[in-house]
Amino acid sequence: MTGVRVKDGESFENAMKRFKKQCEKAGILSEIRKREHYEKPSVKRKKKALAAKKRALKKMRKGF
């Protein structure tokens, strides 16, 4: 769970910025987007295979 304690003399904007940064680092927003709608296991497998294929093509282009 992400939490931020506001320091003495710290503005709300700075505290909010730190909170957003911690949420992004923890991957909370991406997890929420991923769980927003149910995704069938077959669709997950297809997406995973497509992502692997893209990574392989990217590596080939770089020359690794």
UniProtKB/Swiss-Prot annotation:
GO terms for biological process: translation. One of its GO terms (molecular function) is structural constituent of ribosome. One of its GO terms (cellular component) is ribosome. The keyword ATP-binding does not apply. The keyword Ribosomal protein applies. It comes from the Bacteria. Belongs to the bacterial ribosomal protein bS21 family. This is Small ribosomal subunit protein bS21. It comes from Anaeromyxobacter dehalogenans (strain 2CP-C).
